[in-house]
A protein has these predicted regions:
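Axial heme c-ligation environment in periplasmic c-type cytochrome domains
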Residues: 18-73, 182-185, 193, 216-231
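Post-cleavage N-terminal segment of exported redox proteins
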Residues: 45-124, 139-144, 225-261
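Short glycine/threonine-rich turn/loop motifs
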Residues: 1-36, 98-206, 211-219, 254-261
Length: 261
């Protein structure tokens, strides 16, 4: 059995992604992202020609392509555009956090403390005022910044995946990966680009006390290496509880995404 080296990224709210696709940004457009896994030997290990042949043999798909494009000539471009449009329709915006923002529900005391930790910057001078500084990378309404960053998983000598550098050939992009959205993060283990952490608690521990220095490490994370984030056991529990408020249960049960036919 072939073993991949990267964890699959979530596919929702893609319309707000303006800085290429995949962990390393090798796909410029979402329609490009749609067809690359088909041909990847570690994923579907198929050929586009074979996929087109299968689709063309299905009357259901021929009818669908005729309805959309005016004829039943199934091509790679049409297939990619159709998948792109479907993925653009997948949106998640009704988590408990969103309901709290709208004023229709309340966060628990633990969730609220976690939110404040999430949004408060690291403060090396006043520990009691320091937060987890999560919003530095995972800010905004989609809880990501659409950038490629090195989050301190490994030291230079231990990089098993060069990440964005494989695309740009820029050494400063070494081990930098796309910052993912934290929406629905409770339901998408394992975590990090290589799936090395099984739980959110492990992820929090990494940022609190497990950062490895390297040449391309994000400066904000670099600043925390000597002291860590000062998070207590209770802080960690609160932070994870807040992250779980980002789960959108209506999105998870929306049949438009699980059974579009």
């Amino acid at each position: 059995m072939l073993q991949g080296k990267r964890q699959a990224m979530s596919v929702f709210n893609m319309a707000w992604n303006s800085n290429k696709f995949f962990w390393d940004g090798r796909a410029h457009l979402l329609r490009d992202q749609a067809i690359l896994p088909i041909q990847d030997e570690l994923e579907m290990d198929e050929t586009l020609e074979n996929v087109l042949s299968k689709l063309s043999a299905s009357q259901m798909y021929k009818d669908q392509f005729t309805r959309v494009y005016g004829d039943d000539d199934i091509t790679v471009d049409k297939m990619a555009l159709a998948m792109e449009q479907f993925m653009l329709s997948i949106v998640s915006y009704d988590s408990k956090y969103d309901q709290w923002v709208a004023g229709t529900t309340e966060l628990t005391a633990s969730e609220e403390r976690g939110r404040l930790l999430f949004e408060t910057e690291y403060n090396p001078f006043f520990q009691e005022l320091s937060g987890a500084d999560c919003a530095h990378c995972h800010g905004g309404s989609n809880f990501e910044n659409d950038l490629y960053m090195n989050n301190g998983l490994d030291a230079d000598a231990d990089f098993a995946d060069l990440g964005r550098e494989n695309v740009t050939n820029d050494p400063m992009d070494r081990a930098r990966f796309k910052v993912p959205s934290l929406r629905n993060i409770e339901l998408t283990p394992p975590y990090m680009h290589d799936g090395r952490f099984s739980t959110l608690e492990e992820v929090v521990d990494h940022y609190n006390e497990g950062i490895h220095p390297s040449t391309s490490l994000d400066p904000a994370i670099q600043a925390t290496i000597e002291t860590g984030l000062f998070l207590t056991s209770d802080d960690k529990v609160d932070l994870v509880n807040f992250l779980k408020t980002l789960t959108d249960h209506s999105f998870l049960t929306d049949t438009r995404y699980s059974d579009p036919f």
